[in-house]
A protein has these predicted regions:
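Core catalytic alpha/beta fold that binds nucleotide/phospho-ligands
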Residues: 1-204
């Protein structure tokens, strides 16, 4: 498995991130999973890309020494010890592990981000984003930042109303955001890295 591993920290919180873009066929991924003989059965997923996501995620978790995670009612994965977050984008999967609550998102910048801009971007954010030199990439990083914060909380987040991402340059390794909503108010320092074609954001 050619997974890219990152060990990092922000605000005195450490985490371990693994990103994998499998080149194996669906059948090869299934064979690898069956060889592990974990006893866990793949759920009856109709869409082939969902089956591939499930297999790639389980294989990556196993590669990182993580067994089957429990899943809360809101869909958030949890471990008996420590915290876990998972994200998919096209053929890639990433997992992040930390001792504290954490959220992860990965996105590949495309022009399609403009079609959903109003769903996640506030007017104050658009005031500086619309003139950004790398607007598609910048919008993608804002979207990914808000997804990571949503995964941090696990539920009840209005992307445009509850979260504001502060102005940044697209290669900044740390981003700042403010959350104000049903969970109260708090500031986030977000870890950011471009890994291949993907923008990766971790909220701690």
């Amino acid at each position: 498995m050619q997974a890219e591993i990152v060990h990092s920290s922000i605000e005195n919180t450490t985490f371990s991130l693994a990103l994998w873009t499998p080149t194996e066929s669906d059948e090869e991924l299934l064979q690898q999973w069956e060889l592990l003989a974990t006893g866990e059965q793949m759920p009856p997923l109709k869409a082939s890309h969902r089956r591939r996501e499930w297999l790639a995620t389980r294989l990556l978790l196993h590669n990182q020494g993580i067994g089957r995670p429990d899943v809360l009612a809101n869909g958030k994965p949890v471990l008996p010890q420590g915290a876990l977050s998972i994200s998919h984008c096209k053929n890639s999967v990433a997992v992040v592990i930390s001792d504290g609550t954490i959220g992860l998102d990965i996105q590949e910048p495309t022009e399609q981000i403009f079609t959903i801009r109003r769903k996640f971007c506030s007017s104050s954010e658009w005031s500086w984003l619309e003139s950004h030199a790398e607007i598609v990439r910048a919008l993608t990083i804002v979207w990914s930042s808000k997804e990571a914060i949503f995964k941090y909380w696990g539920q009840q987040v209005d992307f445009a109303a509850h979260i504001e991402v502060m102005p940044f340059q697209c290669d900044d390794p740390v981003l700042d955001a403010k959350y104000s909503g049903v969970h109260g108010e708090r500031s986030f320092r977000l870890w950011h890295k471009t890994m291949g074609k993907l923008e990766v954001v971790v909220a701690l």
